[in-house]
Structures are given as structure tokens and as C-alpha cells.
Amino acid sequence: MREEEKIFAGKLFDARTKELRDIKHKAHTLCQKFNTIDEYDEDRLSIIKEFIGNIGEKYYFQGPIQFNYGSHTFIGENFFSNFNLTVMDDARIYIGDNVMFGPNVSLMATNHPLIANERVAMKYPDGHVSMSEYADEIHIGNNVWVAANVVILGGVTIGDNAVIGAGSVVTKDIPANYLAYGVPCKPIREITEQDSKIHLL
């Protein structure tokens, strides 16, 4: 089993292998390129499609951005991200349509064992010793707003139309149509028509 296949199978994997470093190097290099180009340059956004798993036709990243793999992330139509997006997409990350990210959002679909010698000196079946990681997918539904300084951990699903309040750390699933916030993030209440701001037009 290749190292990337171990990630998707939920097994411990060695992120230092050349197989994985080559995938990450491509994403890191293209992110650096994106981050140095003027935001009015028409070629800037096309760089995203050179490393992302898939993305809709309409999207905008304010930047700077940092994807770990890029190819493990799949984004729908009409996506927007504000400043400083970090995507640790060791496991696959799925983002729906019409999703908005505030500044400093981090998606962390990777983890390390709690036991120290497993974390820093794991002996693998082939005999080599290295650090170890494991990863869990993140699923974000349609029409979700993730506000500033939010961290979303692996294994989490956020339902359609949910709003994640600023500064939250999302460790468990959030249901559709809910306002959720806190550390750890918890569903606070359902979003209703009483939340409408149309009167401000």
C-alpha cells in the first residue's frame, strides 16, 4: 500500500516519505507563487487549479494561502476565502457551494498519536523509524459561513447553511441551519427568519 493510500484508509502514515513530500512540494511551491502575485493580476486565481483536487468555476482567495497537499481538497461553486487560509489536507476535505471563510481560518485534517514514542519514533512494518500521523476527512456543506479565526479539526461535518462564530474550535459535527460557536464549538440555536437583515437594505 502506497503512503497516500494509507492516509485515505485511516492508517498511520509517514509524511516524510518522498512520495508524500513530492505532492506537498508542488502545492507549497504554487502557494508561494500565488502569494507573491498582485491580487489584480488575472493569472493569479488560475494557479489554484494547478494543485487543487477540484474547484468550481467561480472562486476567490484573498491570500495568503497555504495548502499542504492541495490535491486532497475539493471545493464547490462560488467559494470565497479572506486572508490567511491554512489547509492541512492530509485527509480529503470537501467544501460545498457558496461557502465563505473569514480571515485566519484553519482546516486541520491531520493528527498525531498522543503517545510520544508513537508520534516521534514509530517503527513501521518495513522496519524504518520515523514520525507518524493519521488523518480524518472534513466535510463542509453548502452555504456555510466560517467566521474569523476558526479552527476546524479532522472528522468534522458541518451541515448546510450553518454559521460558525469567530474564534471557534470545531471538534464535533455541527447540524445544518445552526449558529454555532465556542471553544469547543457547540450548536447555540437554529437560524430562523428572525435573523434576517433585509431591513438594512
Each PLM stretch: what is its role?
Residues 59-61:
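Extracellular beta-strand-rich, repetitive "passenger/adhesive" scaffolds
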